[in-house]
C-alpha cells in the first residue's frame, strides 16, 4: 500500500502486520503505543471495524479527537437484500471519507480537486522503456481479476476482448495471484501487442505506468481506482456488485460502467463485496458480450487524448 502515498511530502506511512508484530489485542496496544509517540492530534477512522474501534477507544482515553466513517451499513443491506430491495444509489465512498475529515475540522471539496502530476520517468527507467515501445498506439491497461468469482468476467470472454483490442492498441495486463500471473503470461505469449506488467514491475513501477496509459479496463477492483486517481478513463465491468454500492472509481461517470442486465438478474447487487452468487446466477456474467466491452472501450478511447506522448 505504501507506494500509493509516496507523492505526499507531509505524510508518514506506518506499515502494520496484524498476523505477526501486531497480532491480537496485545498487538493493538503495541500499535497504539507506537502511534501515540507520533504526537497525533486527531484520528480519522476510515475503516470502522473491530480493530480500529479498539484503537479509537485507546485514543479517546487519552483525549485525542476521533471521528469514524459512516459506511451506511443499513442502506447497504437494503440495497443487496433479495426481497424488498431498495434499489437506489448509496453515497460514494469518497464523500464518506470527506465527511470524516470534515468532522475533524479539515473540510475537503472534491468538486475542486486536482489530479496528481504524472511521475517523471527517466529515459533509462524500465517504465519509460516499456512505454516508449507503444509508438503512436494508445495503451489500454486491463486488470481482468478481482478478489471474488462474482466480480470476475469469464476468462474466455475476456480473451476475446484482449484479442480484438490488441490488433490496433497496446495492451498492458495487471494482476497479482499465482494463477492470475500464469494466465497473464498465456495471453502475453499468444498476442503480439500484449505485455505482462504484473510479473515484471513492482507496485511503485506499476502505478507509474498506470498514470500514463490511455484507458483502464477493470473489474470492481483496486487497479481501476488507482487509474482513476490519475485521471485515467476507467471502464468498469460489474458482476454481482453494482455502481450503486458506492465504489465507482473516482470521477468516472455511470457511462463508463458495464453492468449485468437487472431485468434478467434482479437480485444484483447481491452483496457489496461480490462474494455472493445466488442459485441461477452462476452464468450471469456471460450475458455481458465481449462486443459490448469492446465497443465501449473504443468509444471511451476515441474521446480520450493520448497520455503517454
What do the predicted segments below correspond to?
Residues 1-309:
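Catalytic machinery of carbohydrate-active enzymes
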Amino acid at each position: 500500500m505504501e507506494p500509493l502515498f509516496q507523492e505526499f511530502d507531509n505524510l508518514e506511512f506506518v506499515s502494520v502486520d496484524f498476523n505477526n508484530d501486531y497480532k491480537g489485542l496485545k498487538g493493538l496496544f503495541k500499535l497504539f503505543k507506537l502511534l501515540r509517540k507520533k504526537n497525533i492530534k486527531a484520528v480519522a477512522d476510515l475503516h470502522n471495524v473491530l480493530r480500529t474501534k479498539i484503537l479509537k477507544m485507546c485514543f479517546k482515553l487519552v483525549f485525542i479527537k476521533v471521528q469514524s466513517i459512516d459506511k451506511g451499513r443499513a442502506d447497504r443491506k437494503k440495497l443487496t437484500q433479495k426481497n424488498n430491495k431498495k434499489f437506489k444509489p448509496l453515497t460514494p465512498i469518497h464523500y464518506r471519507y470527506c465527511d470524516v475529515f470534515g468532522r475533524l475540522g479539515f473540510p475537503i471539496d472534491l468538486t475542486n480537486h486536482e489530479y496528481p502530476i504524472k511521475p517523471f520517468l527517466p529515459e533509462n527507467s524500465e517504465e519509460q522503456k516499456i512505454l516508449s515501445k507503444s509508438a503512436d498506439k494508445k495503451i489500454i491497461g486491463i486488470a481482468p481479476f478481482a478478489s471474488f468469482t462474482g466480480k470476475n468476467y469469464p476468462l474466455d470472454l475476456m480473451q476475446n476482448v484482449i484479442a480484438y483490442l490488441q490488433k490496433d492498441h497496446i495492451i498492458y495486463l495487471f494482476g497479482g495471484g499465482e494463477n492470475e500471473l500464469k494466465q497473464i503470461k498465456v495471453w502475453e505469449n499468444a498476442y503480439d501487442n500484449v505485455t505482462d506488467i504484473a510479473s515484471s514491475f513492482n507496485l511503485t513501477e506499476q502505478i507509474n505506468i498506470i498514470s500514463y496509459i490511455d484507458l483502464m479496463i477493470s473489474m470492481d477492483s483496486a487497479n481501476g481506482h488507482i487509474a482513476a486517481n490519475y485521471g485515467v478513463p476507467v471502464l468498469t465491468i460489474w458482476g454481482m456488485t453494482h455502481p450503486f454500492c458506492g465504489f465507482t472509481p473516482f470521477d468516472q461517470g455511470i457511462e463508463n460502467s458495464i453492468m449485468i442486465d437487472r431485468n434478467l438478474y434482479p437480485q444484483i447487487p447481491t452483496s457489496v463485496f461480490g462474494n455472493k452468487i445466488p442459485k441461477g446466477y452462476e452464468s450471469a456474467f456471460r450475458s455481458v458480450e465481449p462486443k459490448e466491452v469492446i465497443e465501449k472501450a473504443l468509444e471511451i478511447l476515441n474521446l480520450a487524448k493520448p497520455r503517454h506522448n
